[in-house]
Swiss-Prot record:
Pfam family membership, one: TP_methylase
Alphabetical UniProt keywords: Cobalamin biosynthesis, Methyltransferase, S-adenosyl-L-methionine, Transferase
Gene: cobM
PANTHER family hit by this protein: COBALT-PRECORRIN-4 C(11)-METHYLTRANSFERASE, SIROHEME SYNTHASE-RELATED
A GO MF term: precorrin-4 C11-methyltransferase activity
GO terms (BP aspect): cobalamin biosynthetic process; methylation
Family of the protein in this entry: Belongs to the precorrin methyltransferase family.
UniProt name for this protein: Precorrin-4 C(11)-methyltransferase
Keyword Transferase: yes
PROSITE patterns: SUMT_1, SUMT_2
Pathway as given in its UniProt record: Cofactor biosynthesis; adenosylcobalamin biosynthesis; cob(II)yrinate a,c-diamide from precorrin-2 (aerobic route): step 4/10
Record-linked InterPro entries: 4pyrrol_Mease, 4pyrrol_Methylase_sf, 4pyrrole_Mease_sub1, 4pyrrole_Mease_sub2, Cbl_synth_CobM/CibF, Siro_Cobalamin_biosynth, Uropor_MeTrfase_CS
Annotated organism of origin: Rhodococcus erythropolis
Length: 249
């Protein structure tokens, strides 16, 4: 049997992938990460399925449930918000399943930062402006940043900066990025991306902290900083060049 780590997307239930929806509908056991997972998705679970909210469970308790289901010959749909490859806390579960000899698969989902970019109506890689994206977070008591991965160090690249799990540290984020990006650099914060209660804030590094505080945003938000957010007059991609040799593949 198999444990499926499923990316449930950023918030809107209809952003789930077709593959994920199919697996959920066929799994007799479904574990989901509390309010971070769209509740509508739970309706996809088959009748009689064991549906468990893991928000208050420890890692040991969660893994025990996964191993128990495997021993009973049951597939498990393990739902995480966003995409399992980014700040999902899936690695710890995978490590233990491998030690226990339990088969697993990872099913990708729509990450929060792409949903945030969609809400802003902006591409995060624009020709001549930025062709790189830094996905990061700020240091917390629970998770310290490795040496060299602080915002000041990462900001020296000038790349489009995407900060997860950092709305409550918006003052720190702005302060550490202003030196390399400038006070007038466009900045945006999208909370609850793709959900009905989504909040979109646009400003600059000089103003965004006050905007975030005024809106009462403290969690479930993505901070995006970079010139791409207001880019104009950039060159067209060579993809559209009339001189480019085109093929059918």
């Amino acid at each position: 049997m198999t444990v499926y780590f499923i990316g449930a997307g950023p918030g809107a239930a209809d952003l789930i992938t077709v593959r994920a929806q199919r697996i959920i509908a066929a799994s007799p056991v479904c574990l989901y990460a509390g309010s971070l997972v769209p509740q509508e998705l739970l309706a996809e679970c088959p009748e009689g399925a064991r549906v468990i909210d893991t928000a208050r469970l420890s890692l040991d308790e969660i893994v025990a449930l996964l191993i128990e289901a495997d021993a009973a010959g049951q597939d498990v749909a393990r739902l995480h918000s966003g995409d399992p490859s980014i700040f999902s806390a899936v690695a710890e579960q995978v490590r233990r399943l491998e030690s226990a000899g339990v088969a697993y698969q990872v099913v990708p989902g729509v990450p929060a930062f792409t949903a945030a970019a969609a809400s802003l109506g902006r591409e995060l890689t624009v020709p001549g402006v930025s062709q790189s994206i830094v996905l990061t977070r700020v240091s917390t008591l629970s998770t310290a940043m490795p040496e060299g991965e602080d915002l000041r160090s990462l900001g020296r690249s000038g790349a489009t900066m995407v900060v997860h799990l950092g709305a409550h540290r918006i003052d720190q984020i702005a302060e550490e990025l202003i030196e390399d990006y400038g006070r007038d650099c466009p900045a945006a914060v999208v909370a609850f991306a793709s959900r009905p209660d989504e909040i979109v804030l646009r400003g600059t590094l000089a103003t965004i902290a006050d905007q975030v505080k005024a809106a009462g945003v403290t969690k479930t938000a993505v901070v995006i900083v970079g010139r791409v957010l207001a880019a104009e007059g950039f060159p067209d991609s060579y993809l559209y060049s009339a001189t480019r040799e085109r093929t059918t593949h």
